[in-house]
């Protein structure tokens, strides 16, 4: 919608651009279905109206799904939400990754590999390093990354750990890789408890 408004007629652009996003959506949604699509401004208003009404409908569906997720996750994994930085969306992504098959998660190392946070050796000469794992479930990897970002910004023990690792010469991507592995280790028992029941 922003691109369409940016290329719209100057009068329409002047009316819509200063509005806050939510007000702009409702304003565009109110555009009539009967706009004259043969005129450029009418066609733009028609397209903006269609897009805005679709956005509002999708927003209603997202809200309903978020409400369902907020009810299901605490029942499926009551202790998972106690892990610092794990919210409803993150817990949902981790639960989907864990699935209902506990046999595929034999250990926390197997869970880490499933999430793509197991270290991959990338040593050269006298330097011992590990690189990011590009495999595994990308949604779970992203969920662990979000937890790591929350912890790096608000969790003092994690911030202290990152400062210590930085002083040792580690780069930020290496620190995040290590944190994701630790978080996977911390989350695993909560998921295992869920899948064992």
Q: Predicted regions: what is each one?
A:
Residues 1-197:
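A detector of single, family-specific signature residues
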